[in-house]
């Protein structure tokens, strides 16, 4: 894949998207699409659409990544707030273009090029967004960003150190029950200190999403959420059947495992602080420092195949894995994608637990998919459903 240009993440230039200019470009594409006289000409316009949306997506994603890398950075906090407001309007513009594509007189030929799943996903998108819900989508974005920053603000005192939620993780899984209990209490103290704010955000989100669903013609938010998650081949009935089977078969099995764990830990009662520990000697621990774990991950991917070696070397060379825990980082982990650089990006918070190894397989598995699909000229093919998360 020599076509893929190398650029370190820190060197990727950021420029705020001018959505008025993006709208102008998109409107010009829609006019050109209308004038196109056959499927081939319309597909050439669609390739220009890819280029425009890749440019916009790259800058939005750069801002989002850099905001989560340091939630105290005022510049990227403002950029995130800007996109929280502007992206819903932009998403609605994209729907207008997609409607032209969907209703093209050359639909059959275009479907052969782009694939039928893309058109099915367009149907779901048409039902998920319109102008009436844009203000609510803007509010929803602001609330989720506020929630993310609230969790990242944790400053938990622990043996003379100040830890965030991610860095407290190892103590929640300590083999010493007293340490586990104390860590849980410290974590709970933090959540209780922000309980009123959490309740407020949750209440606003429930009301917001319910109102969005009603405005779009649904009885509940569940129906809207299925469409936004691109559940294009099954519905609520199938999920309800799965839940019944989980309750009937998996819950009793899970309870039996908890009973075995209680005996293994020599406990009369399994408390909430014991739920993350599997044996009296504690959980399996990754061997080595965070840097050594990452190096071992690179060795593993090098040995798997030529493709995985090429992928992980690319990620390492271009600093596309920011996985070491820091106090100002957002909580959790994710993989995202920077289309202009054909580059996946992995975010995580290594904290010395087995979760560090999970990142090397789970999030890097997503990144490998993104890396491989980057060469596919049909961008819709990279648009995988939520089931793969």
Model-derived features: positions:
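Short beta-alpha connecting loops at secondary-structure transitions
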Residues: 345-349, 376-385
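A well-structured
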Residues: 2-284, 296
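Conserved catalytic alpha/beta cores of large enzymes that bind or transform nucleotide phosphates
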Residues: 258, 378, 389
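Active-site recognition of the HExxH zinc-binding catalytic motif
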Residues: 351-373
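Short, hydrophobic/aliphatic alpha-helical segments
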Residues: 198-210, 318-319, 345, 371-375
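Secondary-structure transition/capping motifs at alpha-helix termini
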Residues: 303-312, 367, 371-380
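Post-HExxH zinc-binding segment in Zn-dependent metallohydrolases
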Residues: 248-249, 373, 383-389
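Auxiliary, metal-adjacent structural segments of Zn-dependent hydrolase domains
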Residues: 280-341, 353-354
């Amino acid at each position: 894949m020599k076509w893929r240009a190398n650029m370190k993440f820190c060197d990727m230039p950021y420029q705020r998207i001018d959505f008025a200019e993006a709208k102008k470009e998109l409107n010009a594409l829609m006019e050109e699409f209308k004038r196109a006289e056959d499927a081939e000409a319309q597909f050439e316009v669609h390739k220009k659409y890819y280029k425009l949306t890749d440019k916009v997506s790259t800058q939005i994603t750069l801002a989002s990544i850099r905001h989560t890398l340091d939630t105290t950075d005022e510049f990227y906090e403002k950029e995130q707030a800007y996109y929280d407001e502007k992206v819903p309007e932009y998403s609605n513009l994209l729907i207008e273009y997609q409607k032209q594509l969907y209703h093209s007189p050359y639909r059959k030929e275009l479907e052969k090029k782009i694939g039928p799943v893309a058109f099915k996903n367009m149907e779901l998108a048409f039902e998920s967004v319109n102008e009436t819900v844009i203000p609510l989508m803007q509010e929803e974005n602001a609330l989720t960003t506020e929630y993310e920053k609230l969790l990242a603000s944790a400053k938990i005192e622990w043996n003379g150190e100040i830890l965030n939620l991610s860095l407290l993780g190892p103590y929640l899984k300590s083999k010493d029950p007293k340490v586990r209990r104390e860590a849980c209490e410290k974590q709970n103290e933090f959540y209780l200190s922000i309980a009123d704010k959490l309740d407020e955000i949750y209440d606003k989100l429930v009301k917001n999403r319910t109102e969005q669903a009603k405005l779009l013609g649904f009885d509940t938010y569940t129906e809207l959420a299925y469409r936004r998650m691109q559940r294009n081949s099954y519905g609520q009935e199938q999920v309800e059947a799965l839940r019944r089977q989980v309750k009937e078969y998996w819950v009793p099995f899970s309870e039996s495992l908890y009973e075995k764990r209680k005996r293994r830990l020599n406990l009369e009662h399994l408390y909430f602080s014991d739920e993350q520990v599997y044996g009296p000697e504690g959980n399996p621990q990754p061997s080595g420092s965070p840097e050594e774990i990452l190096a071992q991950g690179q060795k593993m991917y090098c040995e798997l195949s030529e493709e995985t070696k090429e992928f992980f070397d690319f990620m390492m060379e271009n600093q596309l894995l920011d996985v070491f825990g820091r106090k100002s980082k957002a909580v959790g982990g994710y993989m995202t994608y920077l289309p202009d650089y054909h580059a996946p990006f992995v975010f995580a918070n290594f904290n010395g637990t087995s979760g560090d190894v999970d990142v090397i397989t789970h999030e890097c598995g997503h990144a490998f998919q993104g890396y491989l699909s980057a060469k596919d000229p049909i961008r819709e093919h990279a648009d995988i459903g939520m089931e793969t998360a």
